[in-house]
Amino acid sequence: MLDTEKIKEKLQSSLSIERYIHTLGVAEEAEKLAKRYGDEELVKKAVYAGLLHDCAKDYPAEMKRRFCKEYHIPVDDIMKKQIDLVHPFLGAEVAKREYGVEDEDILEAIRWHTTGK
């Protein structure tokens, strides 16, 4: 898994400035909450999940469709009409494949960050 500085560099080049600032804020808040309620391992996981939760959000629609097909991510009729809804599921795959995340807790946090589980 990439270290947080390398992740930030990569995200800065792939996200809009607004999304990047949002991402840094989410990681910061996730870190604060994890410090309050968990141990150092939870803090680390929370920061990674916070940084990567929207890693696929700014992908163009056609790219999202292509990657969903390539990564075998199910896309229902509602998602087909509103392709941005795939971003948490696609984001988990991108985190795994492009950022080297193997920890299932982090991947699940990314996958379910819009709806919870």
Where are these regions (language model features)?
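An amphipathic alpha-helix signature
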Residues: 4-8, 27, 31, 92
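Generic secondary-structure signature for well-ordered alpha-helical cores
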Residues: 16, 32-35, 115
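Divalent metal-dependent catalytic cores for phosphoryl transfer on phosphate-bearing substrates
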Residues: 9-13, 42-117
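Generic N-terminal amphipathic, Lys/Arg-enriched alpha-helix
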Residues: 2-16
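A positional/architectural concept
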Residues: 22-28, 32-45
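Short glycine/threonine-rich catalytic loop with a Thr-x-Gly-x-Asp
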Residues: 19
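Long hydrophobic alpha-helices with heptad-repeat/coiled-coil character
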Residues: 1-2, 105
